[in-house]
Amino acid sequence: MPKRTDIKSVMVIGSGPIVIGQAAEFDYSGTQACRVLREEGIRVILVNSNPATIMTDPEMADATYIEPISTPILEQIIAKERPDALLPTLGGQTALNAAMALGEAGVLKKYNVELIGASLDAIDRGEDRELFKKVVEEAGAESARSDIAHSLEEVDKIAEKFGYPLVVRPSFTMGGLGSGIAHDEDELHRIAGAGIHYSPTDHVLIEESIEGWKEYELELMRDKKDNVLVVCPIQNVDPVGVHTGDSITVAPVFTLTDREYQKLRDIGIAIIRGVGVDTGGCNIQFAVNPDTGRIIVIEMNPRVSRSSALASKATGFPIAKIATKLALGYTLDEIQNDITQSTPASFEPTIDYVVTKVPRFAFEKFPGADPTLTTSMKSVGEAMALAGNFQESLGKAMRSIDKRHMGFNWDGDKPSEDEVSQLLDAIKVPTEHRYLQIQRALWGGATEEQIFAATKIDPWFIRQFALINETALEVKNAEKLTRKLLKKAKLAGLSDLQIAHLRRLGDEGENTIRELRWSYDLRPVFKTVDTCAAEFDAATPYYYSCYADETELRPRDREAVIILGSGPNRIGQGIEFDYTCVHAVQELGKNYDTIMVNCNPETVSTDYDMSDRLYFEPLTFEDVLEIYEAEKKMGPIKGVIVQLGGQTPLSLAARLKAAGVPILGTTPESIDLAENRELFGEVLKKADMNAPRYGTALSLDEAREAAHAIGYPVLVRPSYVLGGRGMEIVYDDAQLRKYVDRALKEAQADTVVSGRLPSPLLIDKFLQDAVEIDVDALFDGEELYIGGIMEHVEEAGVHSGDAACTLPPSTLSDDQIRRLREGTYAIAKGCGVQGLINVQYAFMANTLYVIEANPRASRTVPFASKATGVALAKAAARIMVGETIQQQRDNGLLLPHGDGGDIHRGQQVAVKESVLPFKRFRTPLGKTVDVLLGPEMRSTGEVMGFDRDFPHAFAKSQLAAYEGGLPTSGNVFISVNDTDKRQLPLFAARLVELGFNIWATEGTASVLRRYGIDSKIVDKISVRMDSDPDDPITTYHAEGSVGKNVVQLIEEGAIDLILNTPNSRGSRSDGYAIRSAAIAADLPQFTTMTEFSAVLMAIEAVRNNDYQIMSIQDHSTQLFELESRD
């Protein structure tokens, strides 16, 4: 059945911003879809609100719209572009829900747009819990006993029928949002209430708990001829009760008999047929009772999912690409397997290695959050590793997480009997540390039976953990490390660093072990991912390392460049850095063999055909050096690029150079010049530039001395971090002591000597009421090219990754822009930058201060590139291999004249807004953690608003970030601190003019009354500064009030918009309860006056709904015309 010829144009909907449960995997799948569609000669119209994606690059589609994924905006684009079909199955839950909304609104019918990949009926049957339950029954399979509830009253009736514990599952949400396991009525009301709220269909499934059962997933595909194949079975190491995104997962499955697996396969095939997915893929989750073998179908996703990306990378089978071809009418037997280039896609993949995925968490960013892992996903990223056996694969995956203390360790004495008892209690509750606690408990003498009783993790896996411990004990106690023992340790997944710790070899121990290993000629070999267990030759070089006998690397002729990726997504280092790596691969591939090293299965950079060679390996010194040494034997290497993947590869630069690896672009010495506070101070002094007064400290006494010399408030942070990790605004000595005590505790015990830290704390004067600016630039040693000047909407103090920003800047004068340009040139020249640099500045009372400089790609590079139409990372890659900025102007990569710092009359305005994951993180009693922003980054993703002026662009950014966007009428609650009350009357008067009603606490209402502005008084709430987030709220009744506090009004749906500026001393004040309630209700809320000023302009601008919709291709053309004109 050949491709359909009636489809000439297709709209693809992306997944929007990176959020927990929906991350970079949809950029990967969407990019594959766009490439397939264009190869087939189909016009592609792409809509996505996330600028930090490869799929929104202009060459990926014929018309690319970086716009909010809302029904009115999508309808405008459909009306303009008139696509023949809509493909919604590659953009996660966002795209699926958007397609359903377009169908229900009659938009698809109105414009005669066909849904391909999955029908509305199939989406409904797969996503709606009640309909799916019927499909399962018709397939002859079993669901957990369950019932549907639309209200808490119905929830209570079901609880009476089934008893506790109960599982709550909402329909049409991703990452288990709104789901959970309830053990009593309070938990049930909290979880089910959130589930009903977050489900677009306002109902939840309440089902019997099957906690402790084994969990499996099947990834299936089906075509029009009813050919069905299972791409990959995946096993969760955690039993049912932990969301699959938060569990360690493995492929192939280890704990099913062949008969059980065939039964799962038969059920899966019956369900994909019953749901009606006939031109694409789906993911089905199963639970198996370990005692009886009873099989329960948990749920399905009738689309490409997070597990699809994992299965694709695990097997080499490109699910998204094939799903797109199936949607166009091809059948599986007509599609070629790209990896073998000799077998059809109808051959089920077979693997002869073990794949392990380990999640990465960020609980440290959300103090007070409940660390318990449940059915609602909480991890922010993941790493994957491949190896010859499970132990080796697990060891590689755990070190790929790139987080201190995340690998097994055997430091110090064995745990005592009391400690083992405590560990056995701790592992009953799943947390991110559970596997380390299991390993420590086994190390201390706990039996495998005790571990199983506490965790219900399958005994096969527990046995593997015990075997790793046994090997570690051998290594620790051996008189001599023989070649045989060293190889056994490597097969057990132990790194050189872990072995060095076991042998107590000190700081140089890792190098000592490597030299010993090399003296034995004990090195990893590299095997190929080929989809067919080596039955056919692989044409694509996709490699993993293992300690086996024969390497499968092939010689090459061209000079190679190795690019180090960014590893697992995390807060502070996300998809933006994968974007810059992919651009470097695309550009350098024209002249060099590109070799990509990364361990993140979600990303475009780890697609099998993106680079000339892909190594799915941990980004550690040991693993990267082994790749370099192996590739050196295969052909010439120009060098390694470390400045595009964020802090992870950057931290390897100095050691790699010391080991003889050539580093391209900015040298490790120059990196240190910018990162080291004292050395950077000298650069600024020579350039006659201001920095906030600062000091450094290695102890509490030094910190106190520095803070007193500078004057409170101060900004305190560790050296060499990304995403503002550990950064805090400190107002007095008591707060400073707490900060230093915590830093000493978090530092590795063996590096702390008598209260002194291993690396200095940086202490800066905090600039209050300053305007913060980010500048991204290119430098080739002589010429500077400004990529973009981005003005923050919030004042200084909010981390640049969380702040909204605008490009071009909206309030800077020509003179201020000139000073920024001159300052950036002086810093880039002084630091010896060769490639990208990001400098953060602040203007306070028209004095320019340099906050920091980063001689690498920054997270704003994709945004600046999309806003200016210039691929900065591509130009940077060419500069790193020795080309000049003038050469990039000549070849068209950069503007022929001027740069991104120039402002042109009539230029479109771009606004970047951050997206925060607060609804995922709750305290143990269910309240959301505080949303107050500060110097430590907490956002997971970003959106971009693009329009003719700042108010319209800002309004679009809010529409993309908040479901429904900004209200244009209704009730506004206002509560501001004393400092902000001076600005309040102007804001309040404008709100009244716009038709809003103002609700305020008594103090704020009193200020407004003096200016003749009416407001309704609400009762004041009080939370002690030192209270626990879960402490009850005290209400103080005010005279003339409406008789309710604001939290009650938010919960009743009476409030539409919130302005709540906090007191300076932190989040445990009254505002916390307000902000928490607003997050639970999905209300737009703003915590700074500067941002609320922008909100007012935006509301005024969009009252007529007159957004300008323009593709970025048209925008780039307009920009080049304006540049030529000016």
Curated annotation (Swiss-Prot):
Region Allosteric domain, as annotated, extends over: 963-1126
Sequence positions that bind Mg(2+) 1: Q285, E299
Domain of life, per lineage: Bacteria
Statement: the UniProt record of this protein carries the keyword Transmembrane helix: no
Which pathway does the record list? Amino-acid biosynthesis; L-arginine biosynthesis; carbamoyl phosphate from bicarbonate: step 1/1; Pyrimidine metabolism; UMP biosynthesis via de novo pathway; (S)-dihydroorotate from bicarbonate: step 1/3
What Pfam family does this protein match (any one)? MGS
Per the UniProt entry, what are the Gene Ontology biological process annotations, in alphabetical order?
'de novo' UMP biosynthetic process; glutamine metabolic process; L-arginine biosynthetic process
Q: List the PROSITE patterns.
A: ATP_GRASP, CPSASE_1, CPSASE_2, MGS
Q: Tell me the protein family, please.
A: Belongs to the CarB family.
Q: How does it assemble?
A: Composed of two chains; the small (or glutamine) chain promotes the hydrolysis of glutamine to ammonia, which is used by the large (or ammonia) chain to synthesize carbamoyl phosphate. Tetramer of heterodimers (alpha,beta)4.
Name the UniProt record assigns to this protein: Carbamoyl phosphate synthase large chain
* Organism (species): Bifidobacterium adolescentis (strain ATCC 15703 / DSM 20083 / NCTC 11814 / E194a)
Gene name tied to this protein: carB
